[in-house]
Amino acid sequence: MAIRVIVAGCAGRMGQTICRLVLADSELELAGCFEAKTNPYVGRDLGEVLGMPHIGIKVEGSLDEVIEKGDVIVDFTFHTASLEHARINAKHKKAMVIGTTGFTKDELSEIHELARQNFPLVQDYNMSTGVNLLVKLCEITARVLSQGYDVEIIEAHHRMKKDAPSGTALKLAQAIAKALGRTDKD
């Protein structure tokens, strides 16, 4: 039986990619998708969003409209939206994958507390194998070079990037700081 996936932010860059990947995987079923109520794709077929023929999945205007159709919610939206989705999901207890960045410490704490009490959660700023390998290499390098060096993280993004520094840059900074026995503010 396929895992029924709901994709939050299906018209965004990551949302579209996730929808395509779910549609291509025989072990997954795209059970539903949604966007912000103000998004022009709400009410239309997801195929229009993806540049594909009609696929029979309507883009809904809220998580409430699709949550009962799925087993897991995949959310790479915006920090305030992801927090609201976690709050809604606390009542429904669906598994959640959150790859959103830009959370404040309080927002992230609330999400983790909601999950601890109500639903399984995978949350990370960057889930790619390459970045997670880079994080490990940064930890090792920081331990080897130790105190004799300054560290600077420089990044570049497309102009549509909504958060800076990125979650990946923060993840790298946290790994280096931990290896050096510092905080990421040092």
Spell out what each predicted region is.
Residues 24-51:
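NAD(P)-binding Rossmann-fold cofactor-contacting core
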Residues 83-92, 99-124, 129-141:
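Rossmann-fold NAD(P)-binding glycine/threonine-rich loop
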Residues 6, 31, 60, 95-97, ...:
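Structural detector of well-ordered beta-strand residues that form the stable sheet scaffold
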Residues 11, 34-37, 102:
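Residues in the short beta-alpha loop(s) of Rossmann-like NAD(P)-binding domains
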